[in-house]
């Protein structure tokens, strides 16, 4: 079978890019011909590295250009592609490009939605602006704008669903959200395929003695989705109480300087900014994994961390958190119904930090 993965940025650092590389390599190892097509190349080489048998192709912007259409059409035809896996199903014009390029060909189109259907960066950005707006007129305007963007998102999702052979979500719990935002009642093309474990851990053997008194965050340092400031607000309540514990942040991003300034202002001494690193060694030694995102799909870091014995402490803003964690059994979830409360998150963490048996 001949497969083609299509995504916005590749090579690049991120969950979608990592999953793409892992799947491309696995399909190639199983004897399939695999191609990866991207519109933007952020880094020189992918991480993890692509198998030498996987071919990387470069398109460009604007997405709907005639040059992109001709190049994609030629690739689909000349390599006799059977399945296109669209990893960038929003905005809808990526799907429109695929359908134009596929016209008259027998290949199938799969759309993969890597987030909760009713949340994205644009919608969350407007919600954040509304929360900060002091002027009632501005708030009313932003509320209307948010409603319009939500309607546009729903229309875009309806288009992608209608023009794809299958529409893949990361959790069964997202099906209802998809139907709500699109207004669709007949959603028989929906499938659920969770993210794979993307960090190699075949040699790992859990040993409580190897675990250190460390809390861990892994991800982009940005304010829209990951909300790393919440992690630091939680840690600011914990650091004075637990002088032998450390917080490590593995990742980088546009909020790094602001987060470092917060640490300096609050005089937090045991916060380590590690930058982009292979997270596996950090998972191995961390006792707790902390994630306080405002929205997620099925976060790779939770799956990866749990596979290395790091106990997850999650903010339950995304329904798939409950697919991964059984509260009080293999981790803890702070319900999102009352909004994020750093004190409650810190109290949950403290309960685990004070009881070594709870961490094992």
Tell what function each PLM region has:
Residues 53-55, 257-276:
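Nucleotide-activated donor-binding/catalytic signature segment of Leloir-type glycosyltransferases, i.e.
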Residues 147-189:
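A short, active-site helix/loop in glycosyltransferases that binds the activated sugar's phosphate group
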Residues 294:
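Aromatic "clamp/platform" in nucleotide-sugar-dependent glycosyltransferases that forms part
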Residues 86-94, 113-116:
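Short His-centered aromatic/hydrophobic patch
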Residues 17-22, 213, 222-237, 254-260:
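A conserved mid-protein helix/loop that constitutes part of the nucleotide-sugar donor-binding site
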Residues 311-315, 320:
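Short hydrophobic beta-strand element within catalytic cores of glycosyltransferases
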Residues 6-13, 19-22, 26-63, 174-177, ...:
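N-terminal strand-loop element at the rim of the active site
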